[in-house]
Amino acid sequence: MLRRSLLPIAICAAVAGAGVASAQTGESLSSSWAQVNICNASQLGARAQLAGDGSSSQMSVRFTLQWLSPSGWVPVTGAATSPWQSAGSAEYTWGQAGWTYNLTLPPGHAYQLRAVAELSWSGENARTATHTTGTCTAGG
């Protein structure tokens, strides 16, 4: 009975060890993404995940809130771009950070909104990437 219950634990430990080894060789174990996690008439929240690569690089992200105007996607007026947010060290498999915008929308009007996330890894493996969230409709 004891032997049967230890087998799944041994398999899990072997898989976990393989994941750590891959992260240390610089292979990305998870993907980077950005998404809207709050969408209503008074707030839009955006969140991003940055994939770690096992290095000592620092990961950070900033967001720019956009609305769909008649001429295409443009930044909202006011403070459209957030400050840089720390997502932690790339030593780990992934890091996340987010930003919440407070909205003031005219009553009776609905707007299509999205956020553009600028992802940054600094240090020995410096690089950047851009991800765009899905859209949401706020107001109405």
Segments the model singles out, each with a brief description of its role:
Residues L2-P8, C12, G19-G140:
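Low-complexity, Ser/Thr/Pro-rich intrinsically disordered linker/stalk segments at domain junctions
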